[in-house]
């Protein structure tokens, strides 16, 4: 069976042209006419591929690679095998990504699955909805009353957009995504299977008649250039809005509770859980599976390591980790101290056993 390809193949290109595009230089300019037909990882590259190397963890792969050429920094240039053309770059990975973005522009954002012919006859669209020219609505999508959708937006198969929702221009609403009570800016990519704008988790707990539901009357506001990973859930606010700031990138399967405010250009890795009424500043990075308690403030530029549990405010530019999270230097010192204590106790027990 032929190997399936999901993205367009780049055109063949000489190494001289590639070096110019990547703002790199050939160690041997006589190799400038050599033709490259694609990009590949070191361990999968063939003679017609360009690879990159910038991490000594992959030194063995570099030594065995069959790549025709390799982007590499001057400090690692001597490690490149003789049969591989050296393409010298100060930041090889950035240069590689720059080339990949040009060669595979169709992979930068989700494309229509069922063609680009506008509105599918299998879609259901309320007559009061307003769709600008160039909107694509795929089969079995449902668009409710008074919805507004901007030009260039794709609504994926089986997606549901509830009444009065506003979606900006050049957005992607992934297949089987559900959006309600939300205002969404321009150039927002929402991957398949997301739920946005549903009730927040608000109750008065353990009353005389059990748990009393608190009305959730806020909205979700997603600003421009945000990306929301597959399976992510974003609850609407109870009184104030849940806000996702401009340029923030959210990984798959993240839970964002009601009333949360996330600043601009934040990074949230997979399976994070954010409890309600958090305030997260700009340029914050949260590792995978971080959990943060409610009503906290995470300062601008803070970073939290993966699988940490946060129960206290974090100051701007703080580097925290652990369970419960604390400044990473303190956390590492405590880990070392505990390991030393266990080691000493083990040694003492052995000595006592000999007696």
Swiss-Prot record:
The active site is at residue 258. It catalyses: a UDP-3-O-[(3R)-3-hydroxyacyl]-alpha-D-glucosamine + a (3R)-hydroxyacyl-[ACP] = a UDP-2-N,3-O-bis[(3R)-3-hydroxyacyl]-alpha-D-glucosamine + holo-[ACP] + H(+). It comes from Bradyrhizobium sp. (strain ORS 278). Homotrimer. It is an enzyme of class 2 (transferase). Pathway: Bacterial outer membrane biogenesis; LPS lipid A biosynthesis. GO terms for cellular component: membrane. Keywords: Acyltransferase, Lipid A biosynthesis, Lipid biosynthesis, Lipid metabolism, Repeat, Transferase. Its EC number is 2.3.1.191. Disulfide bonds: none annotated. GO terms for molecular function: N-acyltransferase activity. The gene is lpxD. InterPro entries: Hexapep (IPR001451), Hexapep_transf_CS (IPR018357), LpxD (IPR007691), Trimer_LpxA-like_sf (IPR011004), UDP_GlcNAc_AcTrfase_non-rep (IPR020573). Catalyzes the N-acylation of UDP-3-O-acylglucosamine using 3-hydroxyacyl-ACP as the acyl donor. Is involved in the biosynthesis of lipid A, a phosphorylated glycolipid that anchors the lipopolysaccharide to the outer membrane of the cell. Belongs to the transferase hexapeptide repeat family. LpxD subfamily. This is UDP-3-O-acylglucosamine N-acyltransferase. One of its GO terms (biological process) is lipid A biosynthetic process. The keyword Acyltransferase applies.
């Amino acid at each position: 069976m032929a190997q399936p390809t999901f993205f367009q193949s780049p055109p063949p290109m000489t190494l001289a042209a590639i070096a110019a595009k990547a703002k790199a230089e050939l160690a041997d300019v006589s190799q400038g006419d050599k033709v490259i037909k694609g990009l590949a990882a070191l361990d999968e590259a063939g003679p017609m591929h360009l690879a990159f190397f910038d991490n000594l963890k992959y030194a063995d792969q570099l030594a065995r690679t069959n790549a025709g050429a390799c982007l590499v920094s001057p400090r690692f240039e001597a490690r490149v095998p003789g049969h591989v053309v050296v393409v010298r770059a100060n930041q090889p990975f950035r240069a590689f990504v720059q080339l990949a973005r040009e060669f595979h522009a169709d992979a930068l954002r989700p494309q229509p699955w069922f063609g680009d012919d506008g509105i599918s006859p299998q879609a259901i669209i309320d007559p009061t909805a307003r769709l600008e020219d160039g909107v694509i609505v795929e089969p079995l999508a449902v668009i409710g009353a008074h919805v507004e959708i901007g030009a260039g937006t794709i609504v994926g198969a089986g997606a549901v957009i509830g009444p009065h929702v506003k979606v900006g221009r050049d957005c992607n609403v992934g297949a089987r995504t559900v959006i309600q009570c939300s205002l969404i800016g321009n150039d927002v990519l929402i991957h398949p299977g997301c739920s946005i704008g549903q009730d927040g988790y608000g109750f008065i707990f353990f009353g005389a008649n059990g748990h009393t539901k608190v009305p959730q009357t806020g909205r979700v506001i997603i600003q421009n250039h945000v990306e929301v990973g597959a399976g992510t859930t974003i609850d609407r606010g109870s009184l104030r809005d849940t806000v996702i700031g401009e340029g923030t990138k959210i990984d798959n399967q993240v839970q964002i509770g009601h009333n949360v405010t996330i600043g601009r250009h934040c990074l949230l890795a997979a399976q994070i859980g954010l409890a309600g009424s958090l305030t997260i500043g700009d340029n914050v990075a949260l590792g995978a599976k971080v959990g943060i308690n409610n009503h906290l403030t995470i300062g601008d530029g803070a970073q939290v390591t993966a699988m940490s549990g946060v129960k206290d405010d974090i100051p701007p530019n703080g580097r925290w980790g652990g369970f419960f999270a604390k400044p990473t230097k303190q956390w590492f010192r405590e880990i070392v101290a505990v390991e030393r204590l266990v080691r000493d106790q083990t040694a003492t027990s052995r000595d006592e056993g000999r007696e």
